[in-house]
């Protein structure tokens, strides 16, 4: 069993990261379980889902047969991409024994910012920023409490070149104030 945290550490040591952003469920979470669950974190809109980055899988089906789908490289164009079906299958199609995943170089810079504002303003800002050339990587809205349900917190992660992240962070500060 290969743990998700071990994979993240191994990739970080090489200046790389997964091409998608899976949630972290603790030290016992496995890479096969991560793919089988098919869950995506707040960067799904920009980074894509797990299934978008599965290149190939080996699995053990219910008849104890080892099956191989896909490959180890991006160029895999023959027939159905069955390996993508494994993402989110929760193990119903078989137990994943090996998986090939797309990885990317780590971004040179990232910044996570949070601001308190109304839900309407948060949606307007995200819509505006999404239509601009800003390095918006992830966002999360956390609803206010029962006393102020229309107020909440908008978390935004900028990721990319150092200058782009700095400019986007400053842009966010200005836009939130207006």
Where are these predicted regions, by residue range?
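Noncatalytic alpha-helical scaffold of FAD-dependent oxidoreductases
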Residues: 2-178
